[in-house]
């Protein structure tokens, strides 16, 4: 879906269930949406990946690749548009009613948050926070993971103000 904001064409290239990890169960970098995002060559790139990596098929087995895979993703966008501004987001919250919340997901989510903060520092990209603005409002995550329209508006505002 495409829209225009302050002279920018805004396009979404998300893939439901996609992982940042290239060895994950649905690697984003192997999806059509990734190729489309590179072809779009945006002036501003917002990356919010990692929530699906909390899957027990992924993080416990491949966590050691997360930072390198994220750096490769960032570098891909820099090749597509060397002048692009890249923002990477701290993960949206996972509500405690999520079925795997206490069986590893909560801890893995925290580990991924720390990895994203490390990546922002070393890849010299801007870190934005998708966690704090939604954390007080679990009702904006009706399935415990994905924001509803109101939650999406909060995230859009976060990006706009960055």
Features from the language model and the residues they span:
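Proline-centered loop/turn at the N-terminus of a beta-strand
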Residues: 9, 84-87, 126
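Solvent-exposed loop/turn segments at secondary-structure junctions
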Residues: 15-21, 51-56, 92-96, 132-136, ...
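Alpha-helical scaffolding segments of alpha/beta enzyme cores, especially the outer helices
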Residues: 65-68, 72-79, 111-118
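Active-site segments of SGNH/GDSL-like serine hydrolases
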Residues: 48-54, 74-110
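Substrate-gating cap/lid alpha-helix
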Residues: 93-130, 153
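Helix C-cap/helix->beta junction micro-motif
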Residues: 6, 80-82, 122-123
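Conserved SGNH/GDSL esterase-like catalytic core that processes O-acyl groups on lipids
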Residues: 1-71, 110
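Histidine-centered active-site loop/cap adjacent to the catalytic His
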Residues: 141-162
């Amino acid at each position: 879906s495409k829209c225009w904001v302050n002279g920018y064409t805004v396009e979404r290239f998300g893939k439901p269930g996609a992982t940042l990890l290239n060895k994950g169960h649905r690697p984003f970098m192997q999806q059509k949406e990734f190729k489309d995002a590179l072809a779009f060559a945006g002036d501003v790139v917002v990356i919010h990946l990692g929530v699906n990596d909390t899957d027990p098929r992924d993080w416990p087995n491949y966590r050691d690749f997360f930072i390198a895979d994220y750096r490769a993703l960032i570098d891909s966008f820099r090749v597509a548009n060397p002048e692009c501004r890249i923002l990477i987001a701290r993960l949206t919250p996972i509500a405690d009613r999520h079925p795997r919340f206490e069986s590893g997901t909560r801890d893995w989510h925290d580990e991924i948050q720390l990895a994203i903060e490390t990546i922002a520092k070393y890849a010299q990209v801007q870190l934005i926070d998708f966690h704090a603005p939604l954390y007080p409002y679990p009702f904006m995550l009706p399935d415990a993971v994905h924001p509803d329209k109101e939650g999406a508006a909060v995230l859009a505002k976060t990006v706009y103000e960055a």
